[in-house]
């Protein structure tokens, strides 16, 4: 994604996540398609919102909450990560997903 930087996008590129495609839509909006199958990802207080949609697989994707790890992944599942939100994800199997980044 050219000019505009999205912190979640940049963070995923420093992990095992593989970027399949991305585009900047303008006006503070970006879209990216990703694949991952084994990773532990900490996302820290981004200055934008992220809407995540699982496209395929994701059955072994775990989210860490205050009371432990929770599995909620699978095709057609949505997750909203609002601006300034911190989260930890443990990806233990194949996962194809898209992110919509917006300010």
What are these regions (language model features)?
Residues 1-10:
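Charged, compositionally biased non-catalytic regions
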Residues 10-11, 17-103:
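N-terminal regulatory/effector-sensing and dimerization cores
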């Amino acid at each position: 994604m050219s000019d505009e930087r999205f912190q979640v996008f940049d963070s995923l590129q420093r992990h095992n996540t593989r970027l399949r495609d991305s585009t900047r839509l303008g006006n503070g909006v970006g879209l990216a398609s990703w694949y991952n199958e084994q990773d532990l990802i900490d996302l820290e207080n981004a200055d934008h919102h992220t809407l995540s949609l699982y496209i395929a697989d994701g059955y072994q994707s775990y989210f860490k909450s205050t009371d432990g790890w929770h599995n909620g992944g699978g095709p057609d599942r949505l997750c909203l990560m609002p601006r300034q939100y911190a989260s930890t994800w443990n990806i233990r199997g194949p996962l194809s997903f898209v992110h919509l980044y917006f300010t």
